[in-house]
Amino acid sequence: EDLHVSVMGHEVLKGVSLEIGEGEIHALFGPNGSGKTTLLNTVMGFSRYKVTKGAIYFKGQDITRATIDERARLGVGISFQRPPTVAGVTLRSLISLSSPSRTNEEIESTAEALDAKDFLDREINAGLSGGEMKRTEMLQIILQSPALVCLDEPESGVDLQNMSLIGKAARTALGRDSFDGTNCRHAMKLRRAGYKSGLIITHTGQIMDHLFVDKGHVLMNGEIVCSGNASELLSEIRDHGYTECFRCAGCERGVCK
């Protein structure tokens, strides 16, 4: 709510207000450098992102000053666009720390479904391709099972062959295993217990071929300038670029509701 965030003394987010309902998935569009990743990392609580004004609420609780660990325990999870390599730490050991209730059988079966079993006993992300890193990130988020799933460009570095696998993993992470695409016009009516909330950064919109997204937002220069139907927003961006989005704040076109 009215979130202002600075990084190294530079204000990146300038009054962002965004509400994601329980079980909703929202997409976040915007050009490079607009503040999208800053928003996700601030929600997760990384220390270099300083909230100078406004607040973050989760499940009715003010978590603005909560630590990363506290937010994770409450049910906030994130998958990075460019996850770091961690020397000396295996993926299996990290999962055991972040998801202590998971059995080894659960870890291995989930990894096998993501074609990531061979990475469990390797150093985290060491020597992995972009697509392989994405699979290990999705493995971690599925096993953590957070109530709010934040995905930073899940399509980045993923080839077409693996995109369907990432899409399926995203559905699992968000509790939508039974949903098979965006053609379900009654998705809102079919909500069931177990649906997670999601905030997904996407440039290409490919992930929307695999998930029903309830709403989209365009972030530019640290401010949300458009909100509306995610598919229509994406179509507008593809046709006209982001310059048209500046007009959305006061326009009456259907895409800018």
Indicate residue ranges for each PLM-predicted region:
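Conserved ABC transporter NBD signature motif
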Residues: 52-61, 111
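ABC ATPase NBD coupling module
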Residues: 50, 62-77, 237
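Conserved structural motif at the start of ABC-family nucleotide-binding domains
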Residues: 13-15, 20
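The feature captures the beta-strand-to-loop junction immediately N-terminal to the Walker
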Residues: 29-31
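Q-loop/switch helix immediately C-terminal to the Walker
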Residues: 78-82, 88-106
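Conserved beta-strand-loop-alpha-helix hinge in the C-terminal portion
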Residues: 210, 215, 219, 223-247
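Walker B catalytic motif
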Residues: 150-154, 159-161
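Helix-to-loop junction immediately C-terminal to a conserved catalytic motif
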Residues: 44
